[in-house]
Amino acid sequence: MLQTMKTLTLIPARLGSTRLPNKPLADICGKPMIVHVADRAAAAKLGRTVIATDSEEIFKVVAAHGHEAIMTRGDHESGSDRIYEALAKLDPSGEVDAVVNVQGDLPTIDPDTIRRALLPLEDGPADIATLGVEITVEEEKTNPNVVKIVGSPLAGNRRLRALYFTRATAPYGEGPLYHHIGLYAYRRSALERFVKLGPSPLEKREKLEQLRALEAGMRIDVEIVKTVPLGVDTQADLDRARTFCSQAGTI
């Protein structure tokens, strides 16, 4: 159950984005984007919230805004590797049961959406939990940047057991298609196993890290939510986040 599962929320952050340089420090309504994400993650109240970064600049900015950060190596190939290093440093005694990995480019994410990512771990047998939303925009069904979930419905269609993730349009036939949201909750043992696995053939083909877990026989359950949080990858995305902030008065 949630109240007995000791959880750590980690936000990986680096400055190496090529499409949007210095992305975590981009200003949104007078506050760096990574701080907006940390505020949202902390509001979810899933245990301790820590930013894992290889940047001293990010570390200092986060600390100046009252959040905890930890320095990690600069040679990690993925956010999963970075959060595993952070977990080992923050909890060497192994007391943490689950780790929630919140992407550092989701400045408008609802804290309740973050909380929902943990549900498949607290009441089911999944190794890894993540989020999805039904696709309602026709163009997104064929957009390779919108990752689709192929899964078996569980719990009255509010959850899926993931069978595959793909950039193609799938599954074929009548019925809803689901957009994958890249926010994960891992059982500690699952994260430890995942990072020790090498990149898998389908992972490399689709360029989707989560396929490594499925190819290794790990179970991923997907909690269905109502909206896709705004991910900031480009200047246009950043402009949308700033517009949202100015219209809402806050994020």
Swiss-Prot record:
CDD domains (alphabetical): CMP-KDO-Synthetase
InterPro entries the UniProt entry points to: Cytidylyl_trans, KdsB, Nucleotide-diphossugar_trans
Annotated Pfam families: CTP_transf_3
Catalysed transformations (reactions): 3-deoxy-alpha-D-manno-oct-2-ulosonate + CTP = CMP-3-deoxy-beta-D-manno-octulosonate + diphosphate
Root EC class: transferase
Involved pathway(s): Nucleotide-sugar biosynthesis; CMP-3-deoxy-D-manno-octulosonate biosynthesis; CMP-3-deoxy-D-manno-octulosonate from 3-deoxy-D-manno-octulosonate and CTP: step 1/1; Bacterial outer membrane biogenesis; lipopolysaccharide biosynthesis
A cellular-component GO term for this protein: cytosol
One term of GO molecular function: 3-deoxy-manno-octulosonate cytidylyltransferase activity
Record-stated family: Belongs to the KdsB family.
Name of the protein this chain belongs to: 3-deoxy-manno-octulosonate cytidylyltransferase
Gene source species: Brucella ovis (strain ATCC 25840 / 63/290 / NCTC 10512)
Encoding gene, per UniProt annotation: kdsB
